[in-house]
């Protein structure tokens, strides 16, 4: 088994200051991993950690430098285009990217998304929707969804409350209802478990073949009982493992996952199989 983490932020040591600054400015109770063997590191250090933990691929949010929202500048924690390009070139197959689309730029933003999706490292787009105060069914997103439908790539979005001081209502999972109907072949991943609207997120994943639930940002001990039960039974083909690193460390999350005692089939689907179905551009695994 080779783990795929569907959502990480930039992991370079210099990004620690950006997290510290954002937390200090907003005064929010958000923590990031600080232990040296599970926190920020350089590319070679992350690959060594991935090899140790059995992780095949990290999917990294990647975007341009621009301010998002009133208090939070999300771009400070994502990879830059050139960083993603360098990671992908130096460590083929280990790092791929989700383009952090900006719906405020109109057609220029759509063209930038199109340019990003033409890159070898791109496997989909990411919507940090709270930064833009737009629900998932906002008209500004539809051209980006259409590009993803054309390119057969996934859309990942932070669902639920915002970790920063931004409007949370726009992250309600029910907002995916109309886009999932309009783009039936496009995979949509409701990240962050949809908390506090977990039942609503699960309902969307149950209703639509193309809607999935992602666990990023919450370590397994903090998953709602509903998420655990969904992953174990009705949603075994619908739940993706993620960390939103550095808010959750890989070593930390994988150790806690063992405590839930999922059977082998559920574990394989959550850690790898479901992600490989959602992200069709992931490197194909060699079968020995």
Kindly give the residue locations of the regions a language model identified.
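Conserved, mostly hydrophobic/aromatic
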Residues: 7, 50, 84, 125, ...
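Active-site environment of divalent metal-dependent phosphoester hydrolases
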Residues: 11-14, 65-68, 103-107, 132-133, ...
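Generic structural signal for well-ordered alpha-helices
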Residues: 43-47, 81-88, 113-114, 141, ...
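Active-site gating/metal-coordination segments in enzymes
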Residues: 56-57, 62-66, 70-157, 161-163, ...
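Catalytic pocket-lining loop regions of alpha/beta-barrel enzymes
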Residues: 120-124, 134-240, 286-287
């Amino acid at each position: 088994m080779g783990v795929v983490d569907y959502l990480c932020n930039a992991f370079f040591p210099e990004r620690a200051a950006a997290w510290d600054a954002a937390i200090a400015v907003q005064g929010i109770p958000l923590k990031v991993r600080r232990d040296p063997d599970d926190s920020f590191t350089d590319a070679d250090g992350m690959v060594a950690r991935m090899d140790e933990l059995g992780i095949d691929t990290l999917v990294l949010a990647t975007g341009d430098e621009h301010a998002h929202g009133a208090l939070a500048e999300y771009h400070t924690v994502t990879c830059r285009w050139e960083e993603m390009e360098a990671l992908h070139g130096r460590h083929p197959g280990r790092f791929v990217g989700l383009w952090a689309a900006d719906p405020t730029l109109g057609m220029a933003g759509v063209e930038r998304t199109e340019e990003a999706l033409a890159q070898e490292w791109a496997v989909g787009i990411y919507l940090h929707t709270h930064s833009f105060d737009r629900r998932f069914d906002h008209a500004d997103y539809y051209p980006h969804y259409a590009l993803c439908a054309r390119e057969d790539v996934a859309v990942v979005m932070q669902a639920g409350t915002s970790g920063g001081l931004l409007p949370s209502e726009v992250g309600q999972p029910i907002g995916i209802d109309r886009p999932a109907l309009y783009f039936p072949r496009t995979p949509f991943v409701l990240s962050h478990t949809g908390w506090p609207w977990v039942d609503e997120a699960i309902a969307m994943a149950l209703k639509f073949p193309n809607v999935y639930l992602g666990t990023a940002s919450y370590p397994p001990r903090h998953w709602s009982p509903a998420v655990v039960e969904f992953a174990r039974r009705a949603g075994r083909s619908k739940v993706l493992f993620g960390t939103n690193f550095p808010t959750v460390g890989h070593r930390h999350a994988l150790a806690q996952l063992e405590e839930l005692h999922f059977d082998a089939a559920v574990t394989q689907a959550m850690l790898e199989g479901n992600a490989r179905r959602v992200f069709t551009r992931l490197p194909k695994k060699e079968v020995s």
